[in-house]
Swiss-Prot record:
Transmembrane segments: 16-34
Pathway named in the protein's UniProt entry: Protein modification; protein glycosylation
Extent of the signal sequence: none
Keyword Glycoprotein included in the entry's annotation: yes
Leading EC class: transferase
Species per Swiss-Prot/TrEMBL record: Gorilla gorilla gorilla
Compartment(s): Golgi apparatus, Golgi stack membrane
Main location group: Golgi
The name this protein goes by in its record: 4-galactosyl-N-acetylglucosaminide 3-alpha-L-fucosyltransferase FUT5
Lumenal side: 35-374
Gene: FUT5
Membrane topology term: Single-pass type II membrane protein
Length: 374
């Protein structure tokens, strides 16, 4: 008998078993990959968006070779295609403005376009001629374009020309990829720093500062009816002068401020409320989106909504009642015991974009800005 004969069947059996185990391992890996891929594919991205592929380009244009070696918060290069309304702003360190953010290199120097990780395009500055003012047709691989607007759809032209251009949205709308509201409330870190309201300094009743006067607009029509029953001091073009630097001092003398928006759209709650009214410690009387929309950002007793009244005459009567009833008037300031208002700045908005880009690496395309925004 060949001394190797008895070992041959055992060797074959072990070889077959190893082959079966290898095939089983390959099958498990394949189905695990398939399941993950399906999970991503069957997610529910925001309407109008399409997830294309993850970003595979490292900061400033180089290809990623080893993802494990990439820092958690790489220094990103962000290009501002234009300054907002062509007005330069100071750019402080993002690490000092947004908790958890690392610093980004933010610049308006268009020469860095080929190396930029992202480009922020302010819609107002390109909307009158998008074909001439948009970015070059050749885009560096992985570069993300961010559509930015703080204006309402009523004041944004040629949105349809932007189909397929942008990867992220940035606006006052809470469903934007980068949410940049005009203002917000935040808790006091300790005792409120503001002194109690000095009611004796409120010597006037109702004010309104308006620069864009359109007689056929909803807010002007409402004012025309309201003033028949209540004295309203109007500041701005063709009205009482309001010298630069005196707005807060002037408006703080009033008990109420008409925070009337120039157009009525979801989440469009602007500096008319956050700055003109709340920073002046005046109770805002709002005309804009629904009360429910306001209550997403403010306590229900922090403002008065025109929709709460059947007519401007009824609103006028209510304001006159509050003027005489100090306790009821002061109830509109109770929320300030625990919360304080904050207002946006361009620099803060840019740093929010910086933080978002650090946190979110997926690459998507906004199919239609117009379909989402209007």
């Amino acid at each position: 008998m060949d001394p190797l004969g008895p070992a041959k069947p055992q060797w074959l059996w072990r070889r077959c078993l190893a082959g079966l185990l290898f095939q089983l391992l390959v099958a498990v890996c394949f189905f695990s990959y398939l399941r993950v891929s399906q999970d991503h594919a069957t997610g529910s991205p925001r309407p109008g968006l399409m997830v294309v592929e993850p970003v595979t380009r490292a900061p400033n244009g180089s290809r990623c070779q080893d993802s494990a070696a990439t820092p958690a918060h790489p220094t990103l290069l962000i290009l501002l295609w234009t300054w907002p309304f062509n007005t330069p702003v100071a750019l402080p360190r993002c690490s000092e403005m947004v908790p958890g953010a690392a610093d980004c290199n933010i610049t308006a120097n268009s020469n860095v376009y080929p190396q930029a990780d992202a480009v922020i395009v302010h819609h107002w500055d390109i909307m009158y001629n998008p074909s001439a003012n948009l970015l070059p047709p050749t885009r560096p691989q992985g570069q993300r374009w961010i559509w930015f607007s703080m204006e309402s759809p009523s004041n944004c032209r040629h949105l349809e020309a932007l189909d397929g251009y942008f990867n992220l949205t940035m606006s006052y709308r809470s469903d934007s990829d980068i949410f940049t509201p005009y203002g917000w409330l935040e808790p006091w870190s300790g005792q409120p720093a503001h002194p109690p309201l000095n009611l004796s300094a409120k010597t006037e009743l109702v004010a309104w500062a308006v620069s864009n006067w359109k007689p056929d607009s909803a807010r002007v029509r409402y004012y025309q009816s309201l003033k028949a029953h209540l004295k309203v001091d109007v500041y701005g073009h063709s009205h009482k002068p309001l010298p630069k630097g005196t707005m807060m001092e002037t408006l703080s003398r009033y008990k109420f401020y008409l925070a009337f928006e120039n157009s009525l759209h979801l989440d469009y709650i602007t500096e008319k409320l956050w700055r003109n009214a709340l920073e002046a410690w005046a109770v805002p009387v709002v005309l804009g989106p629904s009360r429910g929309n306001y209550e997403r950002f403010l306590p229900p007793d922090a403002f008065i909504h025109v929709d709460d009244f059947q007519s401007p005459k009824d609103l006028a009567r209510y304001l006159q009642e509050l003027d005489k009833d100090h306790a009821r008037y002061l109830s509109y300031f109770r929320w300030r015991e625990t919360l304080r208002p904050r207002s946006f700045s361009w620099a803060l908005d840019f740093c929010k974009a910086c933080w978002k880009l650090q946190q979110e690496s997926r690459y998507q395309t906004v199919r239609s800005i117009a379909a989402w925004f209007t």
